Amino acid sequence: MTEPTADSGFETRAVHAGQAFDPTTGAVIPPVHFSTTYAQDGIGGLREGYEYGRSGNPTRTALETQLAALEGGAHALSFASGLAAEDALLRAALTPGDEVLLGNDVYGGTYRLIARVLGAWGVSVRVVDMSDLDAVRAALEERPARIVWVETPSNPLLRITDVAGLARLGHDAGALVVVDNTFASPALQQPLALGADVVVHSTTKYLGGHSDVVGGALVLNDDALYGEVKFLQFAVGAVSGPLDAWLTTRGIKTLALRMQRHSENAQQVASFLSAHPAVARVYYPGLPTHPGHELAARQMSGFGGIVSVALDDAASARRFAESTRLFQLAESLGGVESLMNYPDEMTHASVRGTELAVPPEVVRLSVGIESAADLLADLDQGLARL
């Protein structure tokens, strides 16, 4: 099989990048390489560069090849979790006294990592509404930042940031521009092509896509930064295991199809909720009423599978989150099954009382690929119980 090129279609790259058949047996699906160590042809005589499982593994290499091909990057690194990927990048790019300019609507774990873990080593963090480029410009003029870090769409309020505009502002200020592309996935958005320096993923979510593997990834073009992050990955050991890498690779092969269905179902869910009298507000970039709708339509090829909704008050939100049947109350997102999350006490509990706190009346829906009619019926009965 010939490795797909950058000109190959996204779906072709998702299926074939890094997936050459096994040369020994002809197996169409590459095997999972569980070996922790590799025989050498004499001292230092490595075969294909493999020495020890922490420094490299063929199954992990296959996943990294696939990830780089999908994001259009020169390099990719696969980690044991999304936060492990973030930690390696931050440690490689920052020194004590540096500052991260962070979106004011990001995953609570990211803020916790920077503010509490790296904060103890002299790294500071400021937050700003990344959907307001004037506010970003003012923040960078007030004080320089080493990294500008954004999620778009953001978690959980689905704010949309102009990645190309943000990249220009960040680069003019000498900052590294990092985009967490977890919510959109490379099937819907290509941040590197828009000017970002690094793309971050929790591969646990849409890339894996089946709620059965935890992982993270970085995709980037800069050779020097790649070398620094790869060294830290090796030194710390936060690598994805062979089976985790293989499961993620398998999930990615259907990514384009899944994201299309997630987006279609989410659009129907958002429209239904917008018309429901018990709902105060719906956050979904696919709605024309969303402030970032036109921007999302320009820089994304679909609006994604996450819908957040505000009820009248926190008590109503809690009851709704506990009243659905198909939508399971659980952490995480991006699997084929629909999930319900109450951010204030679940995914974003670590930022309660801060400027990143999520309003307690908000519930986040990860809309799966089930029958849309069944999902709407489930939401309808849940809202009827308020």
Regions found by a protein language model. Name each.
Residues 48, 74, 214, 248, ...:
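Short amphipathic alpha-helical segments
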Residues 37-87, 109-116:
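Conserved N-terminal alpha-helix of the aminotransferase class I/II PLP-enzyme fold
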Residues 37, 220-225, 252, 311-315, ...:
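Short loop segments at secondary-structure junctions
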Residues 19-21, 34-40, 183, 205, ...:
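Glycine-rich beta-alpha junction loops
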